[in-house]
């Protein structure tokens, strides 16, 4: 599964936010836009896979926070069960920049999506059952 898939699962099923929101900004005479992986009422969350391409996560989270006025967060998707060089670098940079850093297991997200329909029913033993 790719970053976009993990972001959609986390954002909609766990964080209660909106995935892939767009925000515009101007640079000189040009108009540009960014996409935020997950946006909640209080946070902009940059979802990153544990690989080299995630090294720009801190910058992306900070710029999204600048545009929205919300708290920046990095959510690292752990696919191999270990803390590697990229997670170490990103976590250190996030701490230096005062950006929240969170980790979540990729397999957990997949299982959460696969069983989400089960959480749409009332719990056994709930009043009236």
Label each residue range with its predicted role:
Residues 100-102:
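Conserved beta-strand segments of alpha/beta enzyme cores
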Residues 85-97:
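Short, aromatic/basic amphipathic alpha-helical patches
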Residues 44, 73-76:
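Structural beta-sheet core signal
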Residues 75-83, 106-108:
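Short beta-alpha junction loops
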Residues 63-72, 96:
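Arginine/glycine-rich "motif VI" loop of SF2 helicases in the C-terminal RecA-like domain
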Residues 1-44, 50-59, 65-66, 86-88, ...:
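Active-site metal-binding core of divalent-cation-utilizing nuclease and nuclease-like domains
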